[in-house]
C-alpha cells in the first residue's frame, strides 16, 4: 500500500493543466488529463475496485467498491483531475515536516508564505505541509481530492472488517 504523501506527490507531478481556450469545445481540454485518467484506471484496477470504466466522450472515470454489508446506502465521491491554467511543467513539490510556525520559502523563487499574511498557517504548527517551489502551481485543487478518495477506497478494500454500502467514485 503506497503512503498517502507519496501518492499525493506522484499525482501533483502530473501536468493536467486546463486549456481555457478549449473550454466547452474539447473534453478534456488537454490530452494530459486523459493520460492521468488512464493511469488512475490502471491504479484502481490494481487496488481492486470493480466496474472501472473511462467514458472517453466526457472524460469521466468511474469505479465501484462493492458493499460488504446489507442495508447501507450507496455513497459517491467525486473529484476533478484538471488544474488551473497556470504553469504546470516540472512541478517540484516541497515537503515541510514539523512546520515551526515561521515563514516558508517557496524554493528559490523569492516567494514566501508568511503567517503575517496567512495567519491560518499557525494552525498547522507541528504538521507536515506540502507546497510548490514557487515556479509552478502545486495542483492540490483537486489532486488532493483524488488522492484522498483513492487512498480511502484502498484502505476500505484492505480492511473488510469496516462495513460499508456500495461506494461509487468518479473522476473527470
Task: Show the residue positions of the predicted features.
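Electropositive phosphate-/nucleotide-binding environments in soluble metabolic enzymes
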Residues: 2, 34, 38, 143-146
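N-terminal capping segment at the start of a domain
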Residues: 2-30, 130-131
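Alpha-helical scaffold segments in soluble metabolic enzymes
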Residues: 7-10, 39, 148-151, 155
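Flexible, glycine/charged-enriched surface loops at secondary-structure junctions
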Residues: 20, 51-53, 161-166
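A non-catalytic alpha/beta surface segment that caps or lines the substrate-entry region
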Residues: 22-72, 76-78, 82
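Beta-rich nucleic-acid/ligand-interaction surfaces
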Residues: 60-63, 166-172
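Active-site metal-coordination/substrate-binding segment of hydrolases
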Residues: 72-162, 171
Amino acid at each position: 500500500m503506497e503512503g498517502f504523501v507519496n501518492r499525493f506527490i506522484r499525482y501533483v507531478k502530473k501536468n493536467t493543466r486546463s486549456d481555457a481556450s478549449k473550454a466547452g469545445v474539447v473534453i478534456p481540454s488537454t490530452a494530459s488529463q486523459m493520460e492521468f485518467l488512464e493511469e488512475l484506471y490502471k491504479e484502481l484496477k490494481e487496488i481492486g475496485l470493480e466496474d472501472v470504466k473511462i467514458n472517453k466522450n466526457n472524460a469521466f472515470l468511474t469505479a465501484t467498491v462493492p458493499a460488504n454489508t446489507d442495508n447501507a446506502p450507496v455513497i459517491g465521491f467525486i473529484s476533478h483531475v484538471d488544474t488551473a491554467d497556470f504553469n504546470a511543467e516540472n512541478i517540484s513539490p516541497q515537503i515541510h515536516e514539523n512546520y515551526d510556525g515561521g515563514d516558508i520559502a517557496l524554493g528559490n523563487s523569492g516567494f514566501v508564505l508568511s503567517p503575517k499574511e496567512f495567519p491560518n498557517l499557525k494552525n498547522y504548527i507541528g504538521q507536515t505541509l506540502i507546497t510548490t517551489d514557487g515556479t509552478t502551481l502545486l495542483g492540490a485543487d483537486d489532486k488532493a481530492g483524488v488522492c484522498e478518495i483513492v487512498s480511502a477506497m484502498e484502505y476500505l478494500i484492505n480492511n473488510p472488517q469496516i462495513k460499508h454500502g456500495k461506494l461509487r467514485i468518479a473522476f473527470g
